[in-house]
Amino acid sequence: MRTKICDLLGIEFPILAFTHCRDVVAAVSKAGGYGVLGAAALTPEELDIDLAWIAEEVGGKPFGVDLIVPAKYEGSDEGGVGSKALKERIPAGHRAFVDGLMDKYDVPPLPEDRERKVNVSDAAPMSYDQAVPLMDVAFAHPISLIVNALGPPPPDMIERAHANGVKVGALAGKASHAVRHVAAGVDLIIAQGYEAGGHTGEIATMVLVPEIVDAVTPVPVLAAGGIGSGRQMAASLALGADGVWCGSIWLTTLEAETHPTVKEKFLTATSSDTLRSRSRTGKPARQLRSAWTEEWEGPDSPGTLPMPLQPLLIAEAQHRIDRAATNPQNEGAVKLANYFVGQIVGSMNESKHADRVVLDMVDEFIDAVTRVNNMME
């Protein structure tokens, strides 16, 4: 296969895999696609270790990094505010609500050493100042693409990337967003539709992709949101995209580090079992429906806080849930456990190796294109 994305990134298949698992990154890149490591939840030290491992594992194959540097967040109009000061802005009522959930669902507390670790890390970096050390680490490794997952990439991210020969990508949920990204110097656009897991906009992939393609041509566009098969890949390219950006589909692979309880939920879920909720990040993000999302939408909920206050508020609770949910006897934690995932979860009913997912997508893509071509005879 050959598209603009294949030429731009030096890959065989225009399949980009967004994942938080370094093993999936390596497997996809080695299979001819392009692995992108989601680094927002990592410390700079952890990112350094993972990128060094990936570089050695892929043997010269290309790979990239995805960060979350939102343009707007609590304290952004003040030039950024430290975690300690931000935590002081969390209302007592919200803290009481989260504590009440832990009691209601009998989620045991963390051991003291785990609790100290949570207090140090607080939450994933979701501000510019917190993301800079991650950028420093990323550019010290042989990445060829850096992506900002939420809003326009900061000017210095673009400048530093281009100075290092690294391409820059950005997600867009509207054509107007994509136009602004291109004007800022972005090299490729990820048109992410409403169906996607994580932070999404309001427009479905089928409508969004051609709108963005028309708005930013000749800049290459990746289609994202509800894509995990060769047929969906063929449809994306027919809409004008130059490749696909897939995230959810890797969460049930054998390499994935997805929480085992959550992975089992994914394997039995339908496409109706997700919703967009602010309950994890403070911004609308599609995730698996669970007792956690239901409680935040319930009549006793105080409502969610803006980013990054919501992640700071729930950091310890999420650690407690994840730790407890590994034991099926902790039924309350199992009910609460969830994670970001797109509507394609309804098709994620089998665990297989990540490289097999890539090759199956390519085979099905060929079959789909052949079928359409035969209609023209």
Residues covered by each model-derived region:
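Active-site entrance/lid segments in N-terminal catalytic domains of soluble metabolic enzymes
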Residues: 1-216
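Residue-level detector of alpha-helix initiation sites
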Residues: 152, 227-228
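Conserved active-site-proximal phosphate/metal-binding subdomains
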Residues: 81-99, 202-222, 228-377
